């Protein structure tokens, strides 16, 4: 979300993203080293436990964090001791700037793993790019191996696509 100040757009996170970093700690002094970042809310499935089949008013992409804002957030997080990053959504593979985000996260001092949670529908299409980006690992959300049940749960026909992507990912590892 961006706000207008003096005819310029700013993020509500600007103060935080421009401040100096100290370790993230809870009230007991435990340091957090893990960041889970939802990159979007859009999804190419309509799982019955997650969202309605239709009538969803997603935020416009201009109201989501831009790649530049995500880069600053990732940098600040790494400066605060975050070493593990998990990128989620919605469906993060729908985000066109996903690969540069993964590459940037991998270049940060102290970050030693970047993982992605996906429903796997687009995995075959983007697997080579994900491998080249330096992605550390994948978590594929898959509720069933039965095609009929998959179609009922997700309200989409796509189990074969997911399994093909999963097989390609296993073969390439």
Segments predicted by a language model, with ranges:
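Radical SAM/AdoMet-radical enzyme domain recognition
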Residues: 71-86, 95-173
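Conserved alpha-helical substructure of the radical SAM core
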Residues: 5-113
